[in-house]
UniProtKB/Swiss-Prot annotation:
The keyword Kinase does not apply. It comes from the Bacteria. It comes from Bacillus subtilis (strain 168). The gene is ytfP. Signal peptide: none annotated. The keyword Nucleus does not apply. This is Uncharacterized protein YtfP. Gene3D superfamilies: FAD/NAD(P)-binding domain, HI0933 insert domain-like, Translation factors. Transmembrane segments: none annotated. Keywords: FAD, Flavoprotein. Belongs to the BaiN/RdsA family. Disulfide bonds: none annotated.
Length: 420
């Protein structure tokens, strides 16, 4: 029967980080994963370039982790985003900063990040087993004691770190295996839901694919409550699809759509094409341009204002022919057209499923986890890190920051615990 100090289950970002941290404490570590290679989620992150962290101040990073980000304050006081940058630079990975604080390897290759982590594991003599499914985690006398593999092999250890991810992006291996093991240790799993996920709509223009493939730049997208008040607004790009809406602004708003759908059957999403101009000013500016070119068609005058497909769509919606000139322009429908430029509303009736989401909302309740150690409050020697925890952030280096920070602390503390 094999015996290790620490067993890490899951070879994603947080599991790799945990195995390295435990190994650096001098612990004998086994890293076990059911897939055929480690770091699969890392390798596809950031469009294959790997957005390893974000350089914004800690306060801002917490704001970009709307799902229990505040739980990470203690963790960040031990190991934060600047420490992540130093960690990678010490492994020989030079990073560069891009828009919104996003940090990428200078090589633009996610694989270089994965390789650097694997080399570090090798240096620390961490035992790696891939293609190995786990049946259960062993608990004896209120203590984590090892694992049982699918073929019945028992492997003992002083500490176990569960780093198996959530239920999103399942082709990388995160299929929700860990929730059962957490429950067996007495943990509560909060309700799971998709976040960072495209939104669906049954609007006729969506079904008819009128705007399919059309992308709007730097628009303000708001999710409205029952009273028509915005719950959240994100100013970014968005995209119309054959099933609804997608793109960065929509992905960020999606978790609020999921929550609001519990209160109303359809959730209004408002699109403001010109967030920096108020409606009256916009009306006056457009009206003035039309007035100054009285013979030109409305389509030709307003073409520079927005993409032609969107312009024609909003004109038709308000019963205005694209070929009318200023003298024939009906004023009331034109006012309504301007209002639609500022507050066109699409009714969302759902989102794509959890396996199509980028991030899982919900997970092991953070109330039952020591925030400085990532240790279970229910079971001695048990640790959690990464997306299995009830923590979720926006895309842009925030989830990976949470995964790497919680992984570092879980590994560090599990290593020290096992050695003591």
């Amino acid at each position: 029967m094999k015996q290790y100090d620490v067993i890490v289950i899951g070879g994603g970002p947080s599991g790799l980080m945990a195995a390295i941290a435990a190994g650096e404490q001098g612990a004998g570590v086994l890293l076990i994963d059911k897939g055929n290679k480690l770091g699969r989620k890392l390798a596809i992150s950031g469009g294959g370039r790997c957005n390893v962290t974000n350089r914004l101040p800690v306060e801002e990073i917490i704001k970009h982790i709307p799902g229990n980000g505040r739980f990470l304050y203690s963790a960040f006081s031990e190991f934060n985003n600047e420490d992540i940058i130093k960690f990678f630079e010490n492994l020989g990975i030079q990073l560069k900063e891009e828009d919104h604080g996003r940090m990428f390897p200078v090589t633009d290759k996610a694989q270089s990040v994965v390789d650097a982590l694997l080399n570090r594991l090798k240096q620390l003599r961490v035992t790696i087993r891939t293609n190995e499914k786990i049946k259960s985690v062993l608990y004896e006398d209120g203590q984590a004691a090892g694992i049982v593999t699918n073929n019945g092999e028992m492997i003992h250890s002083q500490a176990v770190i569960i780093a198996v991810g959530g239920k999103s992006v399942p082709h990388t291996g995160s299929t929700g295996d860990g929730y059962e093991w957490a429950e067996a240790a007495g943990h509560t799993i909060t309700e799971l839901f998709p976040t960072e996920v495209p939104v669906t709509s049954g609007e006729p223009f969506i079904k008819q694919k009128t705007l399919q493939g059309l992308s709007l730049r730097d628009v303000a997208v708001s999710v409205l409550n029952k009273k028509g008040k915005p719950i959240i607004t994100h100013k970014m790009d968005m995209l119309f699809t054959h099933f609804g809406l997608s793109g960065p602004a929509i992905l960020r708003c999606s978790q609020f759509v999921v929550k609001e759908l519990k209160k109303q059957p359809q959730v209004p999403i408002r699109i403001d094409l010109y967030p920096d101009i108020n409606e009256e000013t916009l009306f006056q500016k457009m009206y003035k341009e039309l007035k100054e070119a009285p013979k030109k068609t409305i389509k030709n005058v307003l073409k520079p204002w927005m993409q032609e497909r969107y312009l024609l769509f909003l004109l038709e919606k308000n019963g205005i022919s694209p070929n009318v000139s200023f003298s024939e322009l009906p004023k009331d429908p034109f006012r309504q057209f301007v209002r639609d430029c500022k507050q066109f509303t699409v009714l969302a009736n759902g989102t794509l499923s959890l396996d199509k989401a980028f991030v899982t909302g919900g997970g092991v309740s953070v109330k039952e986890i020591d925030p400085k150690k990532m240790a279970s409050k229910k079971m001695e020697g048990l640790y959690f890190c990464g997306e299995i925890l009830d923590i979720h952030g926006y895309t842009g280096g925030y989830n990976i920051t949470s995964a790497l920070v919680t992984g570092r602390l879980a590994g560090l503390n599990a290593g020290q615990y096992a050695r003591s």
